[in-house]
Each structure stands twice: as C-alpha cells, then as structure tokens.
From Swiss-Prot:
Known tissue expression: Expressed by the skin glands.
Annotated InterPro entries: Antimicrobial_frog_2, Frog_antimicrobial_propeptide
Record has Signal as a keyword: yes
Annotated propeptide span(s): 23-39
Protein name per Swiss-Prot or TrEMBL: Palustrin-1c
GO cellular component term, pick one: extracellular region
Places the protein is found: Secreted
Domain of life: Eukaryota
Biological processes per GO annotation: defense response to Gram-negative bacterium; regulation of insulin secretion
Family under the similarity heading: Belongs to the frog skin active peptide (FSAP) family. Brevinin subfamily.
Classification via Pfam families: Antimicrobial_2, FSAP_sig_propep
Signal peptide limits: 1-22
Location, primary (coarse class): secreted
Length: 68
C-alpha cells in the first residue's frame, strides 16, 4: 500500500511539474502569436503525456501482477 501511494505521489508530482512547464511555454507562445510553434509545443506536450501514461500503466500492471 505504501509503495502504491509513493508511486502515485511521484506520478502526480511529475504531472504537476509538466503542467507548470506547459503553462509557461503556452504563455510565451501566446505572446509571440506564432501558430506553428504552438502546434509543435502541443505535440511535444502530448508526447510527454503519452510517456507519463505509459509509465503509469506499466506501474499499475506491475503492481497488479505483483512482479515488481
């Protein structure tokens, strides 16, 4: 139970940091007004979220099968 809470806390922390960085980048992109850069940033954010989701799924699978 403790390791599950620790893992979820880590995922939450990493997600919060990622979101914070995304908001800063979004603010900078809005000032520039360049649509192409915004699209590239959105794609990089989605890739980061995909990696985070894969890590969460792998962790959940590991905990469910108890093969950690």
């Amino acid at each position: 139970m403790f390791t599950t809470k620790k893992s979820l806390l880590l995922l939450f922390f990493l997600g919060t940091i990622s979101l914070s960085l995304c908001e800063e980048e979004r603010g900078a992109d809005e000032e520039e007004g360049d649509g192409e850069k915004l699209t590239k940033r959105a794609l990089s954010i989605l890739r980061g979220l995909e990696k985070l989701a894969k890590m969460g799924i792998a962790l959940t699978n590991c905990k469910a099968t108890k093969k950690c």
